[in-house]
Amino acid sequence: MIGMKHVFTLAAVFAASWCAAEIALVPAPRQMVAGEGEFVRKGTSVDRAIYDFSADAAVPAEGYRLKVASSGISVAAADERGRFYAEQTLRQLAEERKGVLAFPCVEIVDSPAYRWRGALIDEGRHFFGKETVKNVIDLMAYHKMNVLHWHLTEDQGWRIDVPGMPELVQYGSWRKSSPKHGAKLRHLGKFRYDIEGNGQKYGPFYYTEADLREVVEYAAKRHITVVPEIDIPGHMRSAIAAYPHLTCFPENITERSAHTMWGISTDVLCIGNDETVKFLEKVFDFVCDVFPSEVIHIGGDECPRANWEKCPRCKARMEKEGFTKAGQLQGWITRRIAAHLAKRGRRIMGWDEILADDAPKNAIGQSWRTQGGNGAGTTLVSGAEAARLGYDMVMNPHTETYYDYRQGLEGDPFQYPGGMIPLDRAYAFDPCAGVVPEARRHVLGSQAQMWSEYIWNEYDLAWKMWPRACAMSEVLWTAPEKKDFSDFLRRMRKHRRRLIKMGVNCAPLP
């Protein structure tokens, strides 16, 4: 009997050591030393009762120290965010057995590489609803991501109910038809497109004020800041459906519904119209009331300017301001809204187009273009150049971070617009590529971009987001010198099983 007892003990130790060697954390921590044995606790959930906590101001912001010994678990952090991220690590370490949780013995010292670790969800083209958004928030938190960029307005749909402006959802939250699933968008010329429609009404879909506040509160409990985007002065066809007088040529607005075509509508806000300014100030006041984020995204991308060049009111504004080019009107409205938001203690963020027209120096730029001819053809100020000029930047080159692009999977059942970002390309992304060392402090981070022209529902969304957003989480959290794609794939084999067990429609690994 004594001999059998020793055999059992050795087997248990071997099994525990094997589990420690197979630790698979995503994103990878800054430092980790695996130990021998494990800590076992009754129960099936990771909560604050399972560890001892100590506040330590020496730990970096959002960072933590974690020690799992056979006798218990201890966590140290300087702030609640660090404590929360330690708990996410514990959730990934936990192995559920019959009525107990087992944690491999390990010591971890961890903190993020970047401050801005985000994901964009586009609900202008397709609407997913708050439960799907909450699910995305849960998964972001699980991967230590901290910014949800919520794209709430588009040519194809207006998704927020603004008090005193019922027409926005009455006319802007639905469209009479949508592009047919599987149909391909054809470019017929500058800002001219064609695609087969399905003839089916889409919507009305929108969020009430209570819905918006619920999502903001839900995210805050998970240490995620919700940054709302109201895209101006282009991508506004849904608002123009509600208020045709806000565009340069109202007589051209014959359909009082959102845009039915993918691509960019040439109907944009009239910058020469004082009513446009009043409208935007009222919308952004509501946004400030609902969203506590210091940063408010004002879009600014892909704005066609042909109507401004012909519009008498825009011409009058140009003459009054001494402008020689219609494009300067975009800089004017950017600065006007930035000043208005500054009165509310807020800071604007916009796509890189805003940087070409003298944006305020405290504006945050979001670099998406790789060449100046993209979008509306505005002068390209690259992310690296903008950082050198002193702008804080979120780096999002579409060739690296637009996860609505194809994944390179054989037999992929979902539709994509084009482009290719396989998992290894997503993982190789460097937000500081090309940025001179002295300007890297201005690179806040990056985010996964989930544009929804070809994302039709929550299953489609999850498939395209994960596992590439796992790669993004590691790009933004893990120290660059610690990154290793082969090791990431090894960890992802186990981590993907976790995600699937959680109900995530995670795409296969290569």
Residue ranges and their predicted role:
Residues 2, 9-11, 19-117, 347-351, ...:
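Acidic, contiguous N-terminal accessory segments
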Residues 60-267, 271-295, 336, 340, ...:
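Feature activates predominantly on carbohydrate-active enzymes
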Residues 127-129, 155-161, 233-239, 297, ...:
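Flexible loop/turn segments at secondary-structure boundaries
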Residues 132-135, 207-214, 275-282, 328-336, ...:
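Generic recognition of stable, solvent-exposed alpha-helical segments in well-folded globular domains
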Residues 239-245, 249, 257-363, 369-385:
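Active-site neighborhood of glycoside hydrolase catalytic domains
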Residues 348-353, 358-363, 367-510:
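Flexible, acidic glycine-rich loops studded with aromatic residues
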